[in-house]
């Protein structure tokens, strides 16, 4: 998995994408099989790259910093290392970055205190619509603002220990708590704007560590954010994590889908 890690080199590789950065969900638990039917696995040239969210039969919402020159999409997956009869493979016919996302950030070796990493969103159009099944479903866009203190969770595939490069294979879940952006602002020198959400571990329940970029943040049962960035220290249960807030971007999401479907 990839994650926009603020203390690592963010220079572009030859493909025009961020270099692959391994990620972990530490101290969480294995999600119940197919309990997150909107969960998408975004691949680049046959390798797992990012998470994503199925928001329309033919559209996936993910993080802009997951940009690459080639995408493949898997839906209906739980264990990425096994063949599953619920799985659906899709090619991507086009990609659309949020026009407000600052692409120059991806060319920087280091991020600076004045950098604004808001609007970290990208829509991927599938070449063919997904088949909606028990294991593949759309996640509704939010209709209400999230509340501070909400119980949230996110999910993703990746490493589950700070001491190994072995992936979990199975989809992992972790519980978080939504907190004020001011708390993240004290932890991070980069700009915390009204376009992002800040969450931290709930009762030391686990860590997304380097995270699962592009995955959904679900708060009190409502889709509210897309996993975006944080620092790289793993299993630090004092860490705060930043998610792109979906509500302010609804107009762009809906218009992009309508105009390009």
Swiss-Prot record:
Disulfide pattern: 31-173, 50-66, 152-219, 184-198, 209-234
Pfam families registered for this protein in UniProt: Trypsin
SMART domains noted in UniProt: Tryp_SPc
Residues the record marks as carrying a glycan: 79
BP terms from Gene Ontology: regulation of systemic arterial blood pressure; zymogen activation
GO cellular component terms given for this protein: extracellular space; secretory granule
Propeptide residue range(s): 18-24
Domain Peptidase S1: 25-258
Family per similarity comment: Belongs to the peptidase S1 family. Kallikrein subfamily.
Catalytic site positions: 65 (charge relay system), 120 (charge relay system), 213 (charge relay system)
Tissue specificity annotation: Detected in prostate and semen.
Function (record text): Glandular kallikreins cleave Met-Lys and Arg-Ser bonds in kininogen to release Lys-bradykinin.
Subcellular location(s) per record: Secreted
InterPro entries on file: Peptidase_S1_PA, Peptidase_S1_PA_chymotrypsin, Peptidase_S1A, Trypsin_dom, TRYPSIN_HIS, TRYPSIN_SER
Enzyme nomenclature, EC number: 3.4.21.35
Location (main, coarse): secreted
Signal peptide start-end: 1-17
Native source species: Equus caballus
Protein name: Kallikrein-1E2
Keyword terms: Disulfide bond, Glycoprotein, Hydrolase, Protease, Secreted, Serine protease, Signal, Zymogen
GO terms assigned for molecular function: serine-type endopeptidase activity
CDD domains xref list: Tryp_SPc
Catalytic activity entry: Preferential cleavage of Arg-|-Xaa bonds in small molecule substrates. Highly selective action to release kallidin (lysyl-bradykinin) from kininogen involves hydrolysis of Met-|-Xaa or Leu-|-Xaa
């Amino acid at each position: 998995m990839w994650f926009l890690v603020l203390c690592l080199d963010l220079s572009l590789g030859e493909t025009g994408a961020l270099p692959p950065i391994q990620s972990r969900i530490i101290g969480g638990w294995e999600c119940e099989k197919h309990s997150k039917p909107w969960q998408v696995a975004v691949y680049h040239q046959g390798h797992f790259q990012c998470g994503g969210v199925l928001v329309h039969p033919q559209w996936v919402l993910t993080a802009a910093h997951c940009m690459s020159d080639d995408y493949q999409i898997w839906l209906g997956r739980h264990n990425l290392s096994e063949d599953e009869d619920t799985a659906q493979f899709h090619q991507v016919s086009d990609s659309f970055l949020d026009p407000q996302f600052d692409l120059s950030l991806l060319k920087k070796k280091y991020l600076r205190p004045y950098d604004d990493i808001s609007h970290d969103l990208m829509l991927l159009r599938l070449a063919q619509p997904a088949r909606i099944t028990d294991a593949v479903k759309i996640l509704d866009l939010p209709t209400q603002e999230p509340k501070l203190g909400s119980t949230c969770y996110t999910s993703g595939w990746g490493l589950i220990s700070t001491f190994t490069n072995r992936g979990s294979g199975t989809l992992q879940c972790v519980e978080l708590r939504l907190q004020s952006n001011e708390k993240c602002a004290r932890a991070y020198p980069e700009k915390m704007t009204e376009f992002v959400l800040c969450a931290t571990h709930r009762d030391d329940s686990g860590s997304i560590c380097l995270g699962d970029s592009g995955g959904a943040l679900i708060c009190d049962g409502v889709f509210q954010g897309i996993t975006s960035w944080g620092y790289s220290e793993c299993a630090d249960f004092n860490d705060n994590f930043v998610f792109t807030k979906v509500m302010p971007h609804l107009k762009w999401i809906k218009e992009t889908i309508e105009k390009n479907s």
